[in-house]
Each structure stands twice: as C-alpha cells, then as structure tokens.
C-alpha cells in the first residue's frame, strides 16, 4: 500500500487537492482516506459520498492534532490495508507548524495558498522544510510577481522541494503529482517513523496548568529574556 500525507494551513486547498488526486487515480487504485481535525470535519463525508471510498475521521480533542495523528496512525494503516486499499491518504488538521506529520516513507505534501502572504513559508517551519512536494494553490488570484516571490520563499526554506502550482478546484498542472504517487514505494508499516524530530517535550501548560508566567511552571519552560540554556528546563 502506498501512502500520502497532506499537510498545510486551514483553507489552503488540501481537501480540493485530495479530491483531484482521488478523481484521477480511482480507476487504477483503491483509495482510503483519513481526516484528522480538532473540532469538526466533513471531508470524510464529502469524499465517501462523491467517490464511494472508505473514509474515517479522528478528532484530536485535548491532544495536538498532529500528536493525535501519530497516536492513531498505526491503527489507521491497518484499517486502510484491511479495506483493500492501494493508496492511503491522510489529511492533517494543519494547525501545528512545529509538529510536522510527515513520515520517513510514502510522500509528504504541503499545500500552500498563494494568498496566504509571501512570508508564510518562513513561518511554517517543519511543515514546509520536511515536505517532499509543495503544491501552491489559488495561483489565479495573485499576480505573476507575487507568485515568483512566494516560490522563492519556499525554496529558501526547502531548496530541494518539488514545486507544483495549481488551481486545485480545476486540477491544473497536477499530472506530475499523480505520476509521483504511482511511482512511490509501498510502505512498510512496522518500520514507519516520523520524518522529523518532534518538539522537545510536554510542558505543564499542555497537561492543564493555567497560571500565567514561567514561575508557575516546571519542565520545559521559556522566559522572555533568558538564554536557551538557562530556560530549557526548570525542576519542580
């Protein structure tokens, strides 16, 4: 089974891209889809209705959505394989820029909107720098100069990334992506690990402590003016 992880900020066009991939590959591959989100998601319903493919969704609840994705992915891969799928597509919530959801197998695709601003790639960290492919959407809504600046910014963050520009609603210029999916290796689920390093650790805010100010917290902390070495860890 092949695997595709699609990440990107909200409203960048991730689901529109998933629909184009499904529409173009469904005749040759059986596709399964998992949506990971926080509060509400309807993408699984839309894809099941439009393409009659097996779909599921997971709400992360109190977990970071990408942490939740790591937690459920083993079971999700087993579910997709048991569904007889040749291609498993996972769409992340796109909310945690530090916790890149990509794996060391399969393909990782980041979806970026042309109208998100030219500095967006620099702010997105590992979501861009660890992706295999960047799909830039809504190219019909910006000028050629803006497109070129955005492309340059993406290349500065990740010089080796493959860049594709598209209007995902119409599916223009995506044939290269379809070919890459076809040619990608099948995953070995028992050997899957995250492509990048996760954040340093869990802070006391993550586990529910509400007080404001580092003095009230312990573990991994951060001060306004402290150097990294002295603000990295504080005992109870």
PLM feature spans:
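Canonical P-loop GTPase G-domain recognition
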Residues: 133, 140-195
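Inter-motif core of Ras-like GTPase G domains
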Residues: 92-116, 123-132
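Short, glycine/polar-rich helix-capping loops at beta-to-alpha or helix-loop-helix junctions
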Residues: 41-45, 119-124, 146-153
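P-loop NTP-binding site
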Residues: 2-16, 21-26, 184-236
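Nucleotide-state-sensitive switch-loop elements of NTP-binding domains
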Residues: 2-104, 139, 172
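Structural beta-sheet core signal
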Residues: 33, 110, 134-136
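Short, surface-exposed amphipathic charged segments that create phosphate/polyanion-binding patches used
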Residues: 69-74, 172-185, 204-209
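Short, structured coil segments at secondary-structure junctions
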Residues: 50-51, 104-105, 129-130, 157-159
